[in-house]
Structures are given as structure tokens and as C-alpha cells.
């Protein structure tokens, strides 16, 4: 008989505690017979029948809960995996959603996830700290969620307009379902614990009812006991369940399931509790409605922090009635400085105290010496405001710093009797005795050098494409003005070493700037300019070239440190190259011998050297010296790390090779954006120079199997272009150069010219040069000349003779130029021909082998090498080296082998005998 038709009593299902576990005591008669009476299906555990809606929604809520946990720990990879599973689960529940509508918790997770991803995307610092997998998952998930949310746009919009209402509706629904349950906490997915437990407790099992019977009072009504008996007889018995499951069920039932009110007092208390909850709910709704009405009627509201703002009183520096003297002020200054650098010190308050101390000293006429000393400490405190080296100064602090340095310089220029220096000890300071020169410990040069470093950090940490960068760049005029003032001060009172240091600062702010006014004066002859223009030019001061010459020569003569002299030489060369003074720049580079030992310099100097070499190569290209330009740019471009070597950014592949600290150090060495060299212009100059050198060389050595490559990068671009199955019109700069190279191979200079010089290339490259028209004219002439050389190399075997006038017309070159080019080729033995002066023709000598002969020669050479390799392998297998014994045995190629192996064979024969 099935267990569903058996009746059991309370004694049959009583449980007893064994150790710490709650175990059901089985009946003796049924225990042994149960495996024989029950079928396989009846031995299965009890199943809870749920609807399809509950199953699908539970699957969705579990996935949502996992996503929210991943969001809390910023695990974007886990979010991506669970979001894909969530989409699949939602697809399975589509039929239910079409009937019931989209669940509110699903809309909430979509909106929250999209906002969360947008916050992560905008957090630049956080993105940098992400690992590779999370960063990739963030980009992928952001695209997927934006695409996925388009189908739920209306639901998400309504949710975002009133998210609180959606949450309240869910809360009300859960409160009604729970009917006064003590646990009102709603989880993140809108399903409360009370609702969950109520569903479970609507049809309790027999064991749980029995357990609750024992916990209830014994004075229950007879109807309740009869109902319990009916439940006992009518419910399914759990005798076949494991002891562990029974223990868990009884424990959960006793902990979570509610008890029915047994007395009138309990019923009244429950009723009162429900009334209180309904009243609280009504109060919340009315309060929210009142607030909304006030918001609509009262206009705009202003958000304040912590109520009425209090007027901040100035801190009291001295007690009332204290006499302000030099000693008192210096003592107070030392007290303030003692807290400097300590943990918990308010740096902003410390700066305010020092500024207040300056005002007190000025009001009491304590002298300029005390004010200068306090000013030095204010500037030092401004620099120490950010303890982290990588953090740049805030705009307000930066403005205070510039103003304070200017005020300090005003005082020093107005009072020549004040001497400042690092070598002055605090014991020997003279701050108030006017009979002697005032002496203050401090170094104005160190403050200015730190100011320059802070300016560089500000420019490094500002978005170069924003208006903020332009505003910060305007501050460079103030920085340069301060450097000039300090330069004038140190020229009068500073040492030679200090003058060299301030000169270098001035050079570093001058060398990269193109002097347009001096350039215009060079283009305009002095006779054509009026007298007023000449007077204006004289009043403007010296040109940047004259200034650089004066400052650098002083450093060359007076400096005792290699670093300052090296930086000055490199800046001087850069400035010469920038203004197209090629020969001065080249001679200075060769005489300095910097290329021999630059690898021992520190990284910032190496970056400056790389920038100088690049500018030198661009200068040579503007002058039409393509070979010099190619040689100067070869090291930078062949490495494939031009961006990193020039200090203009870090490569992604190199970021994996260094840790976070090394990356921070590398970023601090980067050059600000306004000092950058255009990398596309640099690559274009290099590739065009390589094209003008490589294409004629390839045509001249076409049959040479061992020809060397002048530029590996140029050959790589040619191979990439040849691999493309379909060739459309060129778009990028590299494609333009490759297409021009193919045209030059055929001697078609016009097509080559159209690919190199056009509107697209003008906008990207050629218009960026100061003298763009001059550069374009030079390029056209170079293309014509090298195309002529390529044509003669390629088709010399076709002609017996060719007229120079014909060549002049083909390449649109004047006759003397054609004559000069051909003469150089004949003299250098590049072209086997002779010039017939009366007829102005080039007579070919035909000493070069034809194409068929070249192929035959190559085949013969390869066959010869193959025979030698086979003989060597055979000798190695036979154990004889040099083939002597084999040749003696059967005379196989005896003479030829002897002649070919020569001395080695003879030496072996001597040792054998």
C-alpha cells in the first residue's frame, strides 16, 4: 500500500535529539519493510510544484542578485557573463512576460547597470587601475547594454522619472502579502523575505505542523486540534525523508513561520499593529505629496550644507595686548613651521596663518627682512600643499604662487640692501638691523625651478584638446617674465653656477618657439621696410637667435657640470634646425660628439637628444638633403617606438613590461603637448626620403640578389601594399607614399607627384611647414630628378642611344640639369654609357647583361652552391673531410676538387703521409 494512504499518529513521527542533530525515530515494523513496499518513484524526495512564472522569475532574480554582487566588487567580467545569461533567461521567459508585462525588477537592473557602467567609463583614474580583462569587458558590456536597452527605452525612462514610486509600489505589495510579518526588509530585486516565507508556509508539511503543535499552548480550541489531526492524516508523511532534512525543516519552521494568535490579547495586538502600519503608510504618502506641492509652488530650491553658513573668524595669532616685535613674529613663524609636514596638519590653514603673519608684520612696520623670510616660507608651503609628487597644483594655489613670487621679486628689486642665499645660516641672519645689510636665508632660484616643474606638471595633467589647456598655456607668459626677472637679479648678485642654471631655464622656454617676426624680417629686405618698422624691430629687443647664442655661449664657457652644457648644446642645435640653419646645426652636433656618449645620460636628456635629431632630420629635408634627413631619422623611425622615444606618450605593449611605479615615473618624463613634434609629419618625411633613395637604388640593382636595403620600414610598407588584393585610391599618408613609389618605379614622375602633393597631403603634412611652398617646389624637383635616374636604370637595356632633349621634355627639366645628372651617373659608374656632345645624345654601351642573361647567371650560381652543399654532406657521411680519400679512390672530380679546396686539401695530405 502506498504511504499516502497510511495514517500515522504523533508517536510515529516524534523526533529525538542525537548529539547535536535532530533525528526522526523510525517505527520498528515499518523500518525493515519500507524498501520492499515502496516503489522507485515513491522513494524520491518530496517535490514542490511551482508554476512556470515562479520558475522563470526566480531564475531572473538569482542572476540579478549575482550581477549586483559583482557590481559591488567592481568585477565587470562577471557582470558581462551574468548579463549574457540574464538575456538568455529573459528570452526563455518571453511568453510569460508578454502576458504579465515586463517585471519592474528587470527594468531596475537594466537602468542601474547602465548608470553603473557610465560611471566606470567616466572615471579615468579607475579605468587606469583596471586589469586588462575588466577594461575589455567594460567596453564590451557598455556597448551591449546600450544596444539592449533600446527595446526597453520607454520603461527605463518612466522608471528614471520616478524611481521612488516604483520602489514604493513594490514595498506596498510586499507589505500586503506579508500581513504584518516582522521582516519588512526588501531585497534589491523587489522580492522580500516575508513574501518568500509566506509562499513556503501556505501549505506546510505534516512534520512542521506537528512541530508547531508542540510549541503552541495546550489550551487550544477543539476545532484547532481537530484541524491539526486532519492535517496529520491528510498530509503526506515524511518518514522516508532523511534525518538531516527533517532537522533543517523543523529548525526553519520554528525560526521563520508565524504563530497563530491564540488569545484575544494576541489578536488585539496584531490588529493594532496592522492599524499602526497602515497609518504610517498613509503618513508617508501624504508627506511626500506635500513636499511635491511645495516644490512645485516654491520655485527653485538651493541646496546648502549643514544649515546657515557661519562667518569664519580669523584665527588669533597673538594674545590681546601682546607687543608685536621681531622676536615675537619669528617665534610665531617657527611655531607654525614646526607643524609643517606632520600628519594631520591642515596645510591650507597653515598657508592662511603665514599670510596673516605677513599682514601683521607689515602693519607693525617690522621691516622688509621679516616679510621676505615669511614670503619664502609661504611659497614653500604652497609647493608642499600636495605631498604626492604626481599631483599637480590646483589653479587657485598656482595663482597664489605666481603672485607671491612676483611680490617677493618686487621687494628684492626695491631693496638692494637685502641679500638672500642658501649659504646664509639662520644664526647669522639679519632681519631688522638697518645699519647693516639685511641677510635672509633662502634661494630664489630653487623656488623658480620648482615653479617651472609645477607648470610642467599642470600642462602634463591637463587635457590638451580642451580650453583649459589653452588657459593654462597663457600662464607661460607670466612664468617667462618671472624667469627673466630672476635672471636680471642673479646677474647682479648671483654666483656663476646660479647664472648658468637660470640661463638654462630661459633656454628651455625659448628653444622650441619659432621666431615669426625674425623670419618675416629675413624675408623682407631692409630697403623695402620703412624707418618706423625698423625702429619698432629695434625696440622689440633681440631676436631669439641672438638670445640663444648669448645664453648658450655663456654656459659653454662658465659651466662646470656636463648636464647643463649638454642640454644647452641640444637646445641650441634644435633652435638652429627649427629656423632652417642646417649647416650651423650640423656642425655644432658633430663638434660636440654627443652621439658618442649620449647613452650614459639620464632619460630626460636622452629625450631631448632624440627630439633634436628629429628636428635636424626635418631641417635637412626642407633643404633638399634627403640622404642626411634619412640618416638623422633612421634610428628613431626604425625602432617603431618614436612616440615613446620622443617623450610624447607610452606604447600599450610597453605598459605590460613595467609596473605601476615605473609607469608613473615614465609619465612624469613626458613632454607637454605644446612641445610635441607631429608624428605623422615625421613619418611622412622619413618615408618620402626613403622613397627618393630606395627606388633608384632598387632599379640599379634589380638583378643583384644580394642587394642591401636602405630602409627596412619602407620595404615593409611596400610589401603591405603588394599584399592587398584590391587596390583602391590611397587614403592614408602611407598609402599615398606607396602609390607614389610604384609610379616612380615606372619612371612616371607626374603620377608620383600627384600622389605626394595633393589637397589631402597638403592638409596633413606640407602645410605644417613654415615655408610650405618652398618645400613643395623642392619636392617636385627631387621627384623629377630621381624619376629620371630610375628611368635610365630601368630602360637602359632597351635603348642604343637616347637624346637628352627627349629626356628634358619627358621630365620637364632644363637641359643642363639633365646633362649634370647623366654625367654624375657615368662618372660614378652607375650607368655604362657615354655622352655625344655634338648630337647631345647618350650612347649606351650595353655592357650590362640582359634580363635573360641575369636569370641564367643566377641559376648557375644557385646550382654551384647546391653542388657544393651536396659534396659537403656526402663527405660528412663518409667520414672524410675535404674529399681527399674519395678523390684518390675513384678520381671523382679530382682536379676540380683540388683546385677548389686548395690549401686545406694540401695541408690534409701532408698530415696523412
Swiss-Prot record:
It is found in: Cytoplasm. Residues 8-21 have a biased composition (Low complexity). This is Eukaryotic translation initiation factor 3 subunit C. It comes from the Eukaryota. Residues 1-44, 157-301, 522-542, 885-913 are annotated as: Disordered. Keywords: Acetylation, Cytoplasm, Initiation factor, Phosphoprotein, Protein biosynthesis. Residues 166-190, 217-232 have a biased composition (Acidic residues). The modification N6-acetyllysine is found at residues 99, 643. Residues 673-849 form the PCI domain. Residues 199-216, 261-278, 886-899 have a biased composition (Basic and acidic residues). Its main location: cytoplasm. The modification Phosphothreonine is found at residue 524. Phosphorylated. Phosphorylation is enhanced upon serum stimulation. Component of the eukaryotic translation initiation factor 3 (eIF-3) complex, which is composed of 13 subunits: EIF3A, EIF3B, EIF3C, EIF3D, EIF3E, EIF3F, EIF3G, EIF3H, EIF3I, EIF3J, EIF3K, EIF3L and EIF3M. The eIF-3 complex appears to include 3 stable modules: module A is composed of EIF3A, EIF3B, EIF3G and EIF3I; module B is composed of EIF3F, EIF3H, and EIF3M; and module C is composed of EIF3C, EIF3D, EIF3E, EIF3K and EIF3L. EIF3C of module C binds EIF3B of module A and EIF3H of module B, thereby linking the three modules. EIF3J is a labile subunit that binds to the eIF-3 complex via EIF3B. Component of the eukaryotic translation initiation factor 3 (eIF-3) complex, which is required for several steps in the initiation of protein synthesis. The eIF-3 complex associates with the 40S ribosome and facilitates the recruitment of eIF-1, eIF-1A, eIF-2:GTP:methionyl-tRNAi and eIF-5 to form the 43S pre-initiation complex (43S PIC). The eIF-3 complex stimulates mRNA recruitment to the 43S PIC and scanning of the mRNA for AUG recognition. Belongs to the eIF-3 subunit C family. The gene is EIF3C. GO terms for molecular function: ribosome binding; RNA binding; translation initiation factor activity; translation initiation factor binding. The modification Phosphoserine is found at residues 9, 11, 13, 15-16, 18, 39, 166, 178, 181-182, 909. Residues 522-531 have a biased composition (Polar residues). GO terms for cellular component: cytosol; eukaryotic 43S preinitiation complex; eukaryotic 48S preinitiation complex; eukaryotic translation initiation factor 3 complex. GO terms for biological process: formation of cytoplasmic translation initiation complex; positive regulation of mRNA binding; positive regulation of translation; translational initiation.
Amino acid at each position: 500500500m502506498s504511504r499516502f494512504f497510511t495514517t500515522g499518529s504523533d508517536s510515529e513521527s516524534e523526533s529525538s535529539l542525537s548529539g547535536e542533530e535532530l533525528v526522526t525515530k523510525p517505527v520498528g515494523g515499518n523500518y525493515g519493510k519500507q524498501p520492499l513496499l515502496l516503489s522507485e518513484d515513491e522513494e524520491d524526495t518530496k517535490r514542490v510544484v511551482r508554476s512556470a512564472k515562479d520558475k522563470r522569475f526566480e531564475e531572473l532574480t538569482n542572476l540579478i542578485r549575482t550581477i549586483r554582487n559583482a557590481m559591488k566588487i567592481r568585477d565587470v567580467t562577471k557582470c558581462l557573463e551574468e548579463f549574457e545569461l540574464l538575456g538568455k533567461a529573459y528570452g526563455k521567459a518571453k511568453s510569460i512576460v508578454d502576458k504579465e508585462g515586463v517585471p519592474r525588477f528587470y527594468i531596475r537592473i537594466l537602468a542601474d547597470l547602465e548608470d553603473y557602467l557610465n560611471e566606470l567609463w567616466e572615471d579615468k583614474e579607475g579605468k587606469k587601475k583596471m586589469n586588462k580583462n575588466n577594461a575589455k569587458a567594460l567596453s564590451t558590456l557598455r556597448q551591449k547594454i546600450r544596444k539592449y536597452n533600446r527595446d526597453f527605452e520607454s520603461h527605463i525612462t518612466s522608471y528614471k522619472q520616478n524611481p521612488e514610486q516604483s520602489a514604493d509600489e513594490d514595498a506596498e505589495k510586499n507589505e500586503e502579502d506579508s500581513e504584518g510579518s516582522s521582516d519588512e526588509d526588501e531585497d534589491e530585486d523587489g522580492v522580500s523575505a516575508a513574501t518568500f516565507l509566506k509562499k513556503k508556509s501556505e501549505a506546510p508539511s505534516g512534520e512542521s505542523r506537528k512541530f508547531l503543535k508542540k510549541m503552541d499552548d495546550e489550551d487550544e480550541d477543539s476545532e484547532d486540534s481537530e484541524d491539526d489531526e486532519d492535517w496529520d492524516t491528510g498530509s503526506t508523511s515524511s518518514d522516508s525523508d532523511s534525518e538531516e532534512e527533517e532537522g533543517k525543516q523543523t529548525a526553519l519552521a520554528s525560526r521563520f513561520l508565524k504563530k497563530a494568535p491564540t488569545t484575544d490579547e494576541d489578536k488585539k495586538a496584531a490588529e493594532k499593529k496592522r492599524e499602526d502600519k497602515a497609518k504610517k503608510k498613509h503618513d508617508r504618502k501624504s508627506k511626500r505629496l506635500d513636499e511635491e506641492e511645495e516644490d512645485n509652488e516654491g520655485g527653485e530650491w538651493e541646496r546648502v550644507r549643514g544649515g546657515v553658513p557661519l562667518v569664519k573668524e580669523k584665527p588669533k595669532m597673538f594674545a590681546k595686548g601682546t607687543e608685536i616685535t621681531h622676536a615675537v613674529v619669528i617665534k610665531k613663524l617657527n611655531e607654525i613651521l614646526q607643524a609643517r609636514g606632520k600628519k594631520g596638519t591642515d596645510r591650507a590653514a597653515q598657508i592662511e596663518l603665514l599670510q596673516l603673519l605677513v599682514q601683521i608684520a607689515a602693519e607693525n612696520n617690522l621691516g622688509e627682512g621679516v616679510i621676505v623670510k615669511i614670503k619664502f616660507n609661504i611659497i614653500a608651503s604652497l609647493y608642499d600643499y600636495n605631498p604626492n609628487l604626481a599631483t599637480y597644483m590646483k589653479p587657485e594655489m598656482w595663482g597664489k604662487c605666481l603672485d607671491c613670487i612676483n611680490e617677493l621679486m618686487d621687494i628684492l628689486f626695491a631693496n638692494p640692501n637685502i641679500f638672500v642665499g642658501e649659504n646664509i645660516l639662520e644664526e647669522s641672519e639679519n632681519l631688522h638691523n638697518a645699519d647693516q645689510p639685511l641677510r635672509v636665508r633662502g634661494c630664489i632660484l630653487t623656488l623658480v625651478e620648482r615653479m617651472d616643474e609645477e607648470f610642467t606638471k599642470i600642462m602634463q595633467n591637463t587635457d590638451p584638446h580642451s580650453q583649459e589647456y589653452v588657459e593654462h598655456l597663457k600662464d607661460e607668459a607670466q612664468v617667462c617674465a618671472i624667469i627673466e626677472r630672476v635672471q636680471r637679479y642673479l646677474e647682479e648678485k648671483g654666483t656663476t653656477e646660479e647664472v648658468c642654471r637660470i640661463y638654462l631655464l630661459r633656454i628651455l622656454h625659448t628653444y622650441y618657439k619659432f621666431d615669426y617676426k625674425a623670419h618675416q624680417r629675413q624675408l623682407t629686405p631692409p630697403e623695402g621696410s620703412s624707418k618706423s618698422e625698423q625702429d619698432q624691430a629695434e625696440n622689440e629687443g633681440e631676436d631669439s637667435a641672438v638670445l640663444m647664442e648669448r645664453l648658450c655661449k655663456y654656459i659653454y664657457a662658465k659651466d662646470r657640470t656636463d648636464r647643463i652644457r649638454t642640454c644647452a648644446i641640444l637646445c641650441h642645435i634644435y633652435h638652429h634646425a627649427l629656423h632652417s640653419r642646417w649647416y650651423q646645426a650640423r656642425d655644432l652636433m658633430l663638434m660636440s660628439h654627443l652621439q658618442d656618449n649620449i647613452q650614459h645620460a639620464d632619460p630626460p636628456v636622452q629625450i631631448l637628444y632624440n627630439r633634436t635629431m628629429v628636428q635636424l632630420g626635418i631641417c635637412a629635408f626642407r633643404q633638399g638633403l634627403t640622404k642626411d634627413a634619412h640618416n638623422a631619422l633612421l634610428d628613431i623611425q626604425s625602432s617603431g617606438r618614436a612616440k615613446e622615444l620622443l617623450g610624447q606618450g607610452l606604447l600599450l605593449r610597453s605598459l605590460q613590461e613595467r609596473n605601476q611605479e615605473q609607469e608613473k615615473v615614465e609619465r612624469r618624463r613626458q613632454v607637454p603637448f605644446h612641445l610635441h613634434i607631429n608624428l605623422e609629419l615625421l613619418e611622412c618625411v622619413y618615408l618620402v626620403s626613403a622613397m627618393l633613395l630606395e627606388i633608384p637604388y632598387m632599379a640599379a640593382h634589380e638583378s643583384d640578389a644580394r642587394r642591401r636595403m636602405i630602409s627596412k620600414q619602407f620595404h615593409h610598407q611596400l610589401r603591405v601594399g603588394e599584399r592587398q588584393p584590391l587596390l583602391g585610391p590611397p587614403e592614408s599618408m602611407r598609402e599615398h607614399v606607396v602609390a607614389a613609389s610604384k609610379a616612380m618605379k615606372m619612371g612616371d614622375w607626374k603620377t608620383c607627384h600627384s600622389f605626394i602633393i595633393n589637397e589631402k597631403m597638403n592638409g596633413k603634412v606640407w602645410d605644417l611647414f613654415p615655408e610650405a611652398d618652398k618645400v613643395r617646389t623642392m619636392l617636385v624637383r627631387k621627384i623629377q630628378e630621381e624619376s629620371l635616374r630610375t628611368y635610365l636604370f630601368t630602360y637602359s637595356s632597351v635603348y642604343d642611344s637616347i637624346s637628352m632633349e627627349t629626356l628634358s621634355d619627358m621630365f620637364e627639366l632644363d637641359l643642363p640639369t639633365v646633362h649634370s645628372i647623366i654625367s654624375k651617373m657615368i662618372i660614378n659608374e652607375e650607368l655604362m654609357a657615354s655622352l655625344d656632345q655634338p648630337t647631345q645624345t647618350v650612347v649606351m654601351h650595353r655592357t650590362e647583361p640582359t634580363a635573360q642573361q641575369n636569370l641564367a647567371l643566377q641559376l648557375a650560381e644557385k646550382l654551384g652552391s647546391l653542388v657544393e652543399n651536396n659534396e659537403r654532406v656526402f663527405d660528412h657521411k663518409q667520414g672524410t673531410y675535404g674529399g681527399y680519400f674519395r678523390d684518390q679512390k675513384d678520381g671523382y672530380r679530382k682536379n676540380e676538387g683540388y683546385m677548389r679546396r686548395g690549401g686545406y686539401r694540401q695541408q690534409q695530405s701532408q698530415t696523412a703521409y
